[in-house]
Amino acid sequence: MKLEVGHIFINDIQFASESKIENGVLYVDEEAVKAIVLEDEKIKSVKFDIAKPGESVRITPVKDVIEPRVKVEGRGGVFPGVIAKVDTVGSGKTYALKGMAVVTAGKIVGFQEGIIDMSGPGAEYTPFSKLNNLVVVCEPVEGIKQHEYEKAVRLAGFRVAVYLGELARELTPDETKVYETYGIMEGKEKFPNLPRVAYVQMLQSQGLLHDTYVYGVDAKRTLSTIMNPTEVMDGAIVSGNCVSACDKNPTYVHENNPVVHDLFEEHGKTINFVCQILTNENVYLADKMRSSDWTAKMCRLLDLDAVIVSQEGFGNPDTDLIMNCKKIEAEGVKTVIITDEYAGRDGKSQSLADADPAADAVVTGGNANQVIVLPKMDKVIGTEDFVTTIAGGNEHSHREDGTIEDADYVVD
């Protein structure tokens, strides 16, 4: 499967009377995008704002971050099963608006949305501080249930992203990246001397606003499955998560999965990047055993030499991570795991809730319990009313001088 991704660089965002992309500037008709969001009767009102790198701006509570894309050639459309009709994506041509994102924010959905600071120490902990962000601040109708509000805000972000992506359909990309993988036997014949490597991506699926969607299907309703890595670049996986900010993969991260991109960089050079295996993180032990069994079985059937396993979330999913690692290693497949740690403020506590000697090759994202002090910002998009209750905060987080002291997992 071959996908060409054309990059349209966005250096600035401005509100205007007409939506268009011109000379690296994204002009947004505020009334047009407002009408798109308000098509959903569950959203009472919506406001839009722009946040740029280096500004004294804080966005909170953050629900999702999305990179606008448009399918210009090939099967299906972006966000299949969610916005576009269900069809296999990952081939043809797709254009992406690079250097910007749609950020959904507003009244808190769960208790684990996060913070994006566009400058200061907090900006160093989030990749989204380096983007020009169009922020969608939604206000729900009275009496709406949490899961209904989450869905409404989630879909609002996707609709706005699709609208903006369409502006690039007739443009010429500033650069184009080509990604290609091969069938099982074809790849083996093409790269006979390279190790066969796959990426096992664990998707948050604990429920109660801890959800991820694959082609529109809630991941907790799935079994481990194989995907072509290019499918994620067309939005085949999207976030519905209100899990702790540093522990969730916003949709932007799925679209630009760094593990996928790093493996493609080595594809055909040092490794044969065979495929991507998706597995979930359900809460019941039987589900964990079933999914990890299937994942290990697939690794063996694909005759893999090695896999990289990444985890989403922490605590309960640590068990899924170790089960996957242990069972895949037992099949004779070398395993590297990617996780973060919750080692206490002093870094001396046990990092994960589970462990096994098989997990002897670990890449860590750092200690999420580390304390960070965020300075007062000149402007807040959304509201700071919830910084004491989001995951990582406490009743003393919001200081009288306007600074915020939290564990660093409040940062999105």
Label each residue range with its predicted role.
Residues 1-223, 407-412:
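Long, compositionally biased, glycine/small-hydrophobic-enriched stretches that function as flexible linkers
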Residues 362-394:
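Extended, charge-rich low-complexity interaction segments
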Residues 188-280:
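Membrane-embedded hairpin module used as a gating/binding unit in multi-pass transport
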Residues 392-412:
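Charge-patterned, long linear interaction tracts outside catalytic cores
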Residues 342-360:
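Glycine-rich, charge-decorated loop segments at or immediately adjacent to ligand/cofactor-binding or catalytic sites
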Residues 204-205, 310-319, 341-344:
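Gly/Ser/Thr-rich loops at beta-strand to alpha-helix junctions
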Residues 330-336:
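A short helix->loop->beta-strand "cap" motif at the edges of active sites that frequently abuts
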Residues 256, 282-296:
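A general structural motif
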